[in-house]
Amino acid sequence: MRCFFLYIFCLALSVSCLAQETIVIKRRLTDVVTERITVLKSDINIKQGLYQAVIGKNIALATGNYDHNKRTGVWHFFNPHGVLIQNFDYTHNHLTYEALDTSSIFHYAIYAPDQDSIAKKDPAAIRIIRPIRIGGKYYGYIPYLRLFRRPKDLYDIDTDRFLVTIELLISPLGRLAEYNVRLRFLGFEKVYHIDINQLSDDDKTFIPATLNGKPIMCQISINCFMSNDGQIDFD
């Protein structure tokens, strides 16, 4: 009888292992970024195991693990040169590391009704913390870059002549409230309002800006360029 139960246990274990068998698939995220995704062999729509986003063959942008399509544990995010810029613990929903912000293409404008009154009382008492995009300053913003391509009515203009600015309005709750792309060319200027419903819930989530510890609204503006194929990107 004991042998029988042992046989049943081993059989169940083998079936379980078979059900969890995984494979790695590759998917192009942008022109230069490729995803390597571990998925269930029985259902490639379920991410299970190691995830990597890389530039070229070996420059990592993001690495972490999935458990049935849910990000788990600590994920690591890098800049395009492979330098670590952020760690985020998805299991405990906690930012564990954020590199010093030295970028000159990101600009922030805060909206705080009581900012002026605080400044008049004690300017040194103002402490502002910028909003943080989970995923870092490159990988985390890829979903927004992918939503815009050069409009057909502007095909006759060289892409390198455009001045492109992404404008993201982040609520005090850390939610993306509005996304605009501003194009400038000589005397021409037009703002394109992007439908944020195309984004996943994760792609609309930020750690909000704060003023003296109080969450506030903030607009992130990013200076970008337009590639020859009409996509927007930034260095």
Question: Which residue stretches match the model-derived regions?
Answer:
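Bacterial Sec-dependent N-terminal signal peptides
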Residues: 1-26, 235
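Charge-biased low-complexity segments
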Residues: 21-235
